[in-house]
A protein has these predicted regions:
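Double-stranded beta-helix
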Residues: 237-238, 275-296
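Linear-motif-rich, low-complexity cytosolic tails and juxtamembrane regions
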Residues: 12, 16, 96-97
C-alpha cells in the first residue's frame, strides 16, 4: 500500500516514463531527432499517407525530388503516325496475326483477343492445400480498337468519338456482366507500359472471380459504408471539392484528382459526383460530360512533357451477380510512370517491391502542375 498519494503518482509517472523510454529504444517508437522546434511540412518532410480503397500506405519523400538522375532514360519517338498503317494488325481491312481479316470499321471495333489470358472452358480444378492452394478459373478477353485512325490516341480524338468509346465500354459491361462476375476494362498506352501495338486500343478481361485489387476495394468500401452509412468515394469527392488542392479537371458530373494517397508521380482518380455503382448506369448526360473530362485530362497528360503520355488506366465498379452494391462507386484509375520528363520514368523496385510504395512529388504538387497546363492538346494548338 502507498502511504502518500502524491508519491504514488510520482512513482507511477517515473514507471511510465521508463516504459516509454524502453519502448522508444527497442524500436517501437523511434527517438526524436532533437529538432523539436521544427514544424512538420508535408512538402519537405517524409511521411506516410493511407489509401482507404486498398487499405495500404504509401511513403511520401518530397525532399528526394531534388536528387540528380543518371539512370535509365526512355526512348521517345513522337513522330506523328499515319491514319492507316498497312502493317498494323488492328487497322481496318488488315489481317491480324491469327489470319482473321478486320472489317472496314468506322466506329470502335471489338474482337476476341487472339492471345487471351483467360479461357471460358477451363476444366474444374481446386486444391485446398494450405501451402499450394490453387483453383481453375474461367473467363474471356477482348480487344477494343478505339477508332479506325491509327495515329490518334484518346486525347487527340474529338469528344463525340470518345462518347462512342464510352458507349462501347458500357455495351461490354452489359453483355459480359450477364455471365461473368468481374469485367475489367483497361488501356495500356505507350511502349513504356508494355503496349504491344501502337494502334490506340483497350482491352476487356472478364472472369468468374474477383481479382485482388477489386476484392480489397469491395471490402474497404463495404466496411466504410457499414460504419458511416455513406459511400467512401462520394465522401471523398465532397472532401476534394472542398479542399480543391488536388483537383486536375472538374466537369458537371465528373471529377479527376491526384488522389491524396497517389503512388505514381502523376496518378489520377476519375470519379462521378453522384451515386453511380457502375459505369453502365451512367445517363446520357453523364456519358457526354465524361467524354469531355477524359479528353481534358489526357490532353493535360500529353501537354506535361509534350509527348504521348504513357499510362495504364482502368475502370472499377460494382461486381456483377451481387445485389448489395450501395457501398460501391464506379471510378477510373490512371497510372502513368513518367516522373521528370518524357524520358525519365519511375521504377517500382527495391523498397517498393520489398516494403511499400514510395513517391517523391506530393499529390498536391503533381495536381498543381497538371492543373496549370492547357486543356487543349499541344498538337491541336499547333494546328490552329
Amino acid at each position: 500500500a502507498c502511504l502518500e498519494p502524491s508519491m504514488c503518482a510520482e512513482m507511477a509517472c517515473q514507471s511510465a516514463h521508463k516504459m516509454a523510454t524502453s519502448e522508444t529504444f527497442s524500436g517501437l517508437s523511434p527517438p526524436a531527432s532533437g529538432a523539436t522546434n521544427i514544424m512538420f511540412d508535408p512538402t519537405e518532410h517524409p511521411h506516410r499517407r493511407y489509401n482507404p480503397l486498398q487499405d495500404s500506405w504509401v511513403l511520401v519523400s518530397p525532399h528526394r525530388a531534388r536528387r540528380p538522375w543518371q539512370g535509365q532514360q526512355e526512348n521517345v519517338d513522337d513522330t506523328p503516325r499515319p491514319s492507316h498503317d498497312p502493317s498494323c494488325y488492328l487497322c481496318p481491312g488488315n489481317t491480324r496475326i491469327g489470319g482473321e481479316v478486320n472489317p472496314d470499321y468506322t466506329q470502335p471495333y471489338v474482337f476476341p483477343n487472339d492471345f487471351p489470358a483467360l479461357l471460358p472452358d477451363t476444366p474444374e480444378y481446386r486444391s485446398d492445400d494450405p501451402l499450394l492452394k490453387s483453383m481453375a478459373v474461367r473467363g474471356t478477353a477482348r480487344v477494343i480498337c478505339f477508332s479506325p485512325d491509327h495515329g490518334k490516341t484518346l486525347p487527340e480524338l474529338p469528344p463525340a468519338v470518345i462518347e462512342t468509346i464510352i458507349a462501347t465500354w458500357i455495351q461490354q459491361y452489359r453483355e459480359l456482366g450477364e455471365r461473368w462476375r468481374w469485367v475489367q476494362i483497361f488501356e495500356n498506352k505507350g511502349a513504356a507500359m508494355g503496349c504491344s501495338n501502337p494502334h490506340p486500343h483497350g482491352q476487356v478481361w472478364a472472369s468468374d472471380f474477383l481479382p485482388n485489387e477489386v476484392a480489397r476495394a469491395d471490402d474497404s468500401q463495404r466496411r466504410y459504408f457499414q460504419a458511416n452509412g455513406r459511400s467512401l468515394l462520394l465522401d471523398y469527392v465532397e472532401r476534394e471539392l472542398k479542399e480543391r488542392s488536388r483537383i486536375v479537371v472538374e466537369g458537371e458530373h465528373w471529377l479527376a484528382v491526384v488522389p491524396y494517397w497517389a503512388v505514381w508521380p502523376f496518378e489520377t482518380l476519375l470519379m462521378p459526383k453522384a451515386a453511380l455503382p457502375r459505369l453502365m448506369d451512367a445517363t446520357p448526360e453523364q456519358q457526354k460530360d465524361l467524354a469531355i473530362v477524359l479528353k481534358k485530362l489526357t490532353s493535360r497528360y500529353d501537354n506535361l512533357f509534350h509527348t504521348s503520355f504513357p499510362y495504364s488506366m482502368g475502370w472499377h465498379g460494382a461486381p456483377f451477380g451481387q445485389e448489395d452494391t450501395a457501398h460501391w462507386q464506379c471510378h477510373a484509375h490512371f497510372y502513368p510512370p513518367l516522373l521528370r520528363s518524357a524520358t525519365v520514368k519511375k521504377f517500382m523496385v527495391g523498397y517498393e517491391m520489398l516494403a511499400e510504395s514510395q513517391r517523391d512529388l506530393t499529390a498536391e504538387q503533381a495536381a498543381e502542375r497538371l492543373r496549370a497546363l492547357p486543356e487543349v492538346h499541344y498538337r491541336e494548338a499547333a494546328d490552329r
